[in-house]
Regions:
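Small-residue helix-packing and pore-constriction motifs in hydrophobic alpha-helices
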Residues: 1-44, 53-64, 73-84, 94-176
Length: 177
């Protein structure tokens, strides 16, 4: 128990350094990072996802240029979406890595989407939520595609680059509850 507690503390300290380095340009301070990690730790205690996975993922998301508060909310939403689809902690970790790369690039492409579907996350519920958000944000119209076309061929529609980082971020924040 003592070693486990120390290991978690050590992980938290390393994560704080990484997150501060990734978010310094946003004016993020130690108190803000610590509060976000505490929130995720409390959340992790209530789910099958451990604090180590959460801190690794927040590091990935902040490295993609996302502010720490937004990243913490998105990680909770991602974990909720993973849990709702029955995704394992290991599957979610791999998908989170791929998603962080896509968020950094600004667009979720088919290969990124497949990383979600391969672990069971890219289901109809997620697709519907993303389509509704993209439609409300005007992203579909801006990319000359309709919600009906996306619903008809979700995977093929991703070639139109309508699934932006902003759409996915909004979806994950909503899923955070």
């Amino acid at each position: 128990p003592v070693n486990a507690g120390f290991a978690e503390y050590e992980l938290k300290m390393g994560s704080i350094q990484t997150i501060l380095a990734n978010t310094a340009r946003h004016g993020t301070g130690l108190d803000q990072v610590t509060a976000s990690l505490e929130e995720l730790n409390t959340y992790a205690d209530k789910t099958i996802y451990n604090f180590g996975d959460m801190t690794k993922n927040i590091g990935l998301f902040t490295n993609a240029g996302i502010k720490v508060d937004d990243a913490a909310s998105m990680i909770k939403g991602f974990s909720n979406a993973a849990a709702a689809s029955g995704t394992s902690a290991q599957g979610a970790a791999g998908a989170a890595y791929q998603l962080s790369q896509a968020l950094s690039a600004g667009t979720i492409r088919l290969m990124d989407w497949r990383s979600l579907t391969n672990v069971g996350m890219g289901n109809k519920n997620m697709q519907t939520g993303l389509i509704e958000i993209a439609d409300a944000m005007g992203t579909l119209e801006a990319n000359t595609i309709t919600a009906e076309e996306v619903q008809g061929d979700f995977n093929g529609s991703l070639e139109k680059n309508w699934l932006s980082a902003d759409v996915m971020s909004s979806y994950l924040k909503i899923m955070a509850g």
